[in-house]
Amino acid sequence: MSASSPNRRRILSLWLPRLPIDRIKRKLSGSSDALGNTPSVVVAKQHNAILIHSLDDLAVRAGLSIGLPLANARAICPELTVFDADEVADRKTLDDIADWCDRFTPLVALDPPYGLFLDITGCAHLFGDERALLQIVSGALAHRGFTVSAAIAS
């Protein structure tokens, strides 16, 4: 069965691995105290420890990683900007992105905490082809400040 077969579903998978920090940076982007060149992380309490939950590129380049205790992160990078995790706000942001994706297909499903599935069966030709649709969606999300990984499969 070919990829264009009417019986084969085509799914565009979107993964937003840095949704928590991207959401915060988008919120702060218009303020005068924008983060600039300061490494930033989102932390969450797990088993009586405060751990990095999400981080930006600057924090990665500074040697930080998801799961690292905040105390260790501050020792590595004293100028670190820290935000508390907010799962409700992250979920609302994912819901908002899903609503935005309705412009590409009426069949959008959440894959929490940071993913979406778009059933693009029969829709891709409206945007050129599957490759063009993938580039349009991922490019538009990147332009809006989100780190995104995307793939299409059956």
Describe each PLM feature range.
Residues 123-127:
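Short, charged/polar, Gly/Pro-enriched secondary-structure boundary elements
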